[in-house]
Amino acid sequence: MSAEILRVHPDEPQPDRIDYIVSCLRKGDIVALPTDTFYGLAVDPVNLYAVEGIYRLKTRQKHKPLSLLISSVAQAYELARDTDSLLDKLADRFWPGPLTIIVRAGTKLPLRSTANTGNVALRVPDAAIPRAVVERFGLPITATAANLQGASECTHAACVRDQIGDRIPLIIDGGPTGRSLPTTIVDLSLGEGRWEILREGAIPTHEIVMVLQR
């Protein structure tokens, strides 16, 4: 069975369509939707059946946690523990935007949702559709790239349809995404004010360093 394609306005998402997306997430469905980098696969991160579905679809190694999209810095503090001023510095400068920040996970997320690492990767996207979904859902959503392992990331809905349209129930067509580079990833879970840039992406390394060394 082919996925349903649902067109949603990229800048002013229709509330009834956001409600429909949320209802699918609450059922445990996998939903492909646009972010500000690539199309991602969204599920309810506390629904372990749905989380396992993404790992099966992507043939993703079980020790690799899924990143989560959130709607605000306040939500990051609800999901994290043992945070420090580095999170504020990065969030103030780069959120919403293509920066993923790894922090120690709090108790609101099942350990399996962190791939048993105890850490969680968070991001506030600069894209209206996923932020509207998170706000309406009341929980973060997963955001792993909507592509098969080894295939190119998707910047438009047709690419998602061609790669995995027969394996997921719903694809949100919000037009092309704004960037063709992945997020930059910074690990703040090390504690004691330590940090590490794990991947340089849309935000150059030197910009991250400038902010963190202030």
Predicted feature locations:
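Active-site-adjacent structural elements in enzyme catalytic cores
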Residues: 1-214
